[in-house]
Amino acid sequence: MVSKIIKLGVPTATLAVGTLLLGDDEKRSAFFRTASAFTQNHGHKTFDEHFPRGEWDKNWDFRDPISLVDKGKWEKADEEGKKKLIEEKKATATRNIFLIRHGQYHLDHEVKMLTPLGREQAELLGKRLANSDIKFTNMTMSTMVRATETANIILKHLPDDLTRTSSPFIEEGPPYPPVPDHKTWRPLDPEFYTEAARIESAYRKIFHRASPSQKEDSFELIVCHANVIRYFICRALQFPPEGWLRMSLGNCSLTWITIRPKGHVSVRSIGDIGHLPPNKISFT
């Protein structure tokens, strides 16, 4: 507590010493009144000195309307024409991306197929999605066996006409050298170099605001792997990518990320396993 007070500056430290002579309620009231006043006068500067923060990149997906305008048309257009060109490129729909981790699988098996528990987890998730009253737009699944098995079990509970595709780009792999290092899991640099490029490519393909031609909100299912999902979360929120390994995701967990028309990104849930009873939860 003392070290935090010192970091906030002398006026706050002086206040803290003075409040030692007051009762508990009086201490809290006096401290926060003065701390509030101090923050209003010095808050942003003081806070930023000790907790540096980066700016949000508004054009993180390079789909800001002006980025999509044809340069030739832009140069020839007058002011009204430029406004019209920008308006035509504005997104109006919201994209909802549901990242699903596969079910529990046999770690020691060459094919790494789902265990009986993993299949049961996928069934329970499929039922949850079917009862959600959400009209899902499409599903993309990793080509690895455990993800494909999970996706196919889920699909039994969803409409037959749901568009589905497979992608090798969202297969499991090391997305970025983690900080801190893992004690036992240490891929070689060449593996990071190649796999990180693949997973980053998948991120750029999947995560972006809606196309101007998309008129309705979309609800997209992505069935893949823990490393990939955790990296996607960091990138989507513009968090340091080296922090991806600090999160843990259960099998058949659900992560919901929303991308709004202006490019604002928000996370509605991370690793949600509310559809699994306690005895069906696993993290393998």
From Swiss-Prot:
GO terms for molecular function: phosphoprotein phosphatase activity; protein serine/threonine phosphatase activity. Keywords: Hydrolase, Membrane, Mitochondrion, Mitochondrion outer membrane, Transmembrane, Transmembrane helix. CDD domains: HP_PGM_like (cd07067). Its EC number is 3.1.3.16. Its main location: mitochondrion. GO terms for biological process: positive regulation of mitochondrial fission; protein dephosphorylation. GO terms for cellular component: mitochondrial outer membrane; mitochondrion. It catalyses: O-phospho-L-seryl-[protein] + H2O = L-seryl-[protein] + phosphate; O-phospho-L-threonyl-[protein] + H2O = L-threonyl-[protein] + phosphate. Coiled coil: none annotated. The keyword Transcription does not apply. It comes from the Eukaryota. InterPro entries: His_Pase_superF_clade-1, His_PPase_superfam, Mito_Ser/Thr_phosphatase. It is a single-pass membrane protein. It is found in: Mitochondrion outer membrane. The keyword Membrane applies. Belongs to the phosphoglycerate mutase family. BPG-dependent PGAM subfamily. Displays phosphatase activity for serine/threonine residues. Has apparently no phosphoglycerate mutase activity. Interacts with skn-1 isoforms a and c. This is Serine/threonine-protein phosphatase Pgam5, mitochondrial. It comes from Caenorhabditis elegans.
